[in-house]
């Protein structure tokens, strides 16, 4: 199989409280306590879930085979305790993004549809990464960011404004 079996674990799906919805990401996995990984929680932000596809790929990123799977599998290898306190952000997000990209091919879609959606998602992530470097490294202004996205056909100022503010906050 693509993903080795993991020990039995439990998962609770909770919803982001209404008061916090506009400030939080589409979903997030709460990493369990280092000494008790049997209880896992994923919070879903309902206002960010446009459709079943978004929900499916988000849960793949946050749950199985994403963050939840990676956490439970890693802990089942009995790692040196120091590995559980160190943060490897690129590795963790890289794995979850890989899992999310794989999830397009697990949906009831044709292989062509899955490939188009997966590649579109990859391009969007690449545009975010380029904008992040432009804003934080090259000092892009809001207008620079709007011009950057316009070159890729994204011309809605409100959308680019949201992206700009999101990147500034990260």
Predicted regions mapped to residue ranges:
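Long, His/Glu/Asp-enriched segments that create or flank divalent metal/ion-associated functional microenvironments
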Residues: 1-170
């Amino acid at each position: 199989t693509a993903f080795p079996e993991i020990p039995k674990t439990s998962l609770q799906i909770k919803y982001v409280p209404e008061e916090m919805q506009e400030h939080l990401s589409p979903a997030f996995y709460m990493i369990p306590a280092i000494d008790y990984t049997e209880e896992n929680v994923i919070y879903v932000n309902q206002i960010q879930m446009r459709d079943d596809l978004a929900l499916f790929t988000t849960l793949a990123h946050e749950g199985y085979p994403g963050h939840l799977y990676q956490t439970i599998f890693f802990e089942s290898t009995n790692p040196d305790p120091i590995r559980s306190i160190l943060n490897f952000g690129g590795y963790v997000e890289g794995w979850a993004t890989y899992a999310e990209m794989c999830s397009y091919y697990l949906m009831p879609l044709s292989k062509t549809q899955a490939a188009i959606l997966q590649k579109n998602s990859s391009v969007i992530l690449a545009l975010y990464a380029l904008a992040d470097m432009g804003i934080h490294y090259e000092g892009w202004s809001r207008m620079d960011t709007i011009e950057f996205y316009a070159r890729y056909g994204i011309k809605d100022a409100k959308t680019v404004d949201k992206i700009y503010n999101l990147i500034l906050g990260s």
